[in-house]
From Swiss-Prot:
This is 5-methyltetrahydropteroyltriglutamate--homocysteine methyltransferase. It is an enzyme of class 2 (transferase). Pfam families: Meth_synt_1 (PF08267), Meth_synt_2 (PF01717). Belongs to the vitamin-B12 independent methionine synthase family. PANTHER family: 5-METHYLTETRAHYDROPTEROYLTRIGLUTAMATE--HOMOCYSTEINE METHYLTRANSFERASE. L-homocysteine binds at residues 431-433, 484, 599. CDD domains: CIMS_C_terminal_like, CIMS_N_terminal_like. The gene is metE.
Amino acid sequence: MTILNHTLGFPRVGLRRELKKAQESYWAGNSTREELLAVGRELRARHWDQQKQAGIDLLPVGDFAWYDHVLTTSLLLGNVPARHQNKDGSVDIDTLFRIGRGRAPTGEPAAAAEMTKWFNTNYHYMVPEFVKGQQFKLTWTQLLDEVDEALALGHKVKPVLLGPVTWLWLGKVKGEQFDRLSLLNDILPVYQQVLAELAKRGIEWVQIDEPALVLELPQAWLDAYKPAYDALQGQVKLLLTTYFEGVTPNLDTITALPVQGLHVDLVHGKDDVAELHKRLPSDWLLSAGLINGRNVWRADLTEKYAQIKDIVGKRDLWVASSCSLLHSPIDLSVETRLDAEVKSWFAFALQKCHELALLRDALNSGDTAALAEWSAPIQARRHSTRVHNPAVEKRLAAITAQDSQRANVYEVRAEAQRARFKLPAWPTTTIGSFPQTTEIRTLRLDFKKGNLDANNYRTGIAEHIKQAIVEQERLGLDVLVHGEAERNDMVEYFGEHLDGFVFTQNGWVQSYGSRCVKPPIVIGDISRPAPITVEWAKYAQSLTDKPVKGMLTGPVTILCWSFPREDVSRETIAKQIALALRDEVADLEAAGIGIIQIDEPALREGLPLRRSDWDAYLQWGVEAFRINAAVAKDDTQIHTHMCYCEFNDIMDSIAALDADVITIETSRSDMELLESFEEFDYPNEIGPGVYDIHSPNVPSVEWIEALLKKAAKRIPAERLWVNPDCGLKTRGWPETRAALANMVQAAQNLRRG
């Protein structure tokens, strides 16, 4: 039984973000559709060749997407919302872009589809929309075309297809409500047609992704798998593919399916290999997801070998990445600024392919010398002073319950804060950032490249902060911000100023569409060598008599939007960040900053996939926030901000944060999100966002007043703040001024009654 290797998918964007540049050029009308398609062909050919050269046996085809793979599947099935359809009923790449972005070079603009997180990753997918009575048919042949492309290049191909049950699970019903699972029988004929076409092309194995099988699914959804896969069997061999968690809780459902193989994530799941081997049908292939597709760390291949060696020769076996390598940067070799020691600890997508080749060869031959050589830097890292800081570890171990408690309860603090700030009813503020103009971005870039000295850079930033204060005073806002001109990204900025993080030059990963992010990497214990935000906050406060908020990104968000260490728990990392930022709160307070905002937009999105694991996560997530904030005195007002999400199932935890004021995104839900706070009888102050900053549209005074009156029916007016939904970084100054002027006017009208 020869062991093969494969990946579940490969990054799409290109080493230099070629796909992003081609997409945005096409959207702007600066290049043709054919030029865009040519970039896609070139990237696919390059990525297949790179994987093959790195030693991958079976190449994934169908993992490439022009915007998002869930959206690609929707088009494959003919699932195009009516507002995005071409008049002649055809489907083309602009149809896809209209669904993803709301507009494209051709066709009428229409509201984009909803976007949300892909399971518990930082990748986003476009949510399929379902309406009663809709029809499905094969309308978008991208998968088949790309299989033809790869076969023509002589590759050994393994098509990748998102499975029918997971695709339905990820979608939402629009309009008249019905059970979306009832659509399953309507989409199966399209899947049958696709599998038949693949069989005609001589395809042996198809990777059919059903990550929903790692969730705690309702019984009706689990029951749907058997009839679905009964309908799909027989044309090609199916590798049922799961990831992001283990499958043991749903293994009875899985083993009843007529498939020929199962892929399991042996990195994030707690599945026992021996138990899997015992319970899987003996003629099934097991694809062992041993190499972490979601992180950047070199694998301990001697450990991975030991994990799987006992079943070698006992069943058909492949070794693989735990999930698609989409979530990893492409190539470590182009990182020239990382020092040799730190660089030796990492493996990006291409290096992970090499790891799979080494592992396959060792399992086939029994010779593990190459594995030991590869794993040597991991042993060295365990003892590196870059990783371990005894002072941080000692401080973390000394945390007591008192460290996460404010001195007094909210009611006492609120009285002290009212006496200090004397704010009017319906106080107005913004969430933190102001427009990042071309001038600001150029200033930062010139400084980063060494084209501008520190003095001139600081003078430039100070001028932009001064402008932000002048603008806010002119508008009549009550609580001001400094505008964050010095910050490129709310996580990267803090990572750059904390020990324990490193940054890459080209470590880009796709977030959605053409948006890529370059997450910081946590390599060791985290500490704050010097104050981070104090100087600019103090300067901004010196320009005005009104309170200026200090602005921090919270510990859970910094954790969730970084590549974490694997040698300590996420809880440990979050609490180390919390302790570092606790010192920042104390220093801001000492500098005269009386209102400090600690943003936690990622608190909810960091939830584990299984609800049974939520309590433990929320307990340490809340504790980390409180450690960060609890050093503040009674008359220092702590704010937090959370982006658009469902709050009702975590209201206990939101209240437990004990922030004096929480600002939330609510305008898109027409204040309906406040229902959770009303039902819970949330005791502290709330700033429900009164307009959507993602749109350039300027809300009218009447619109904002109406929303605030609606909010006051749910939350007592004396506990309401008036603010936009989110930061204003991506907006231009003209619409920002106009929208904020109307917001301030609406608040003033309500004060007059």
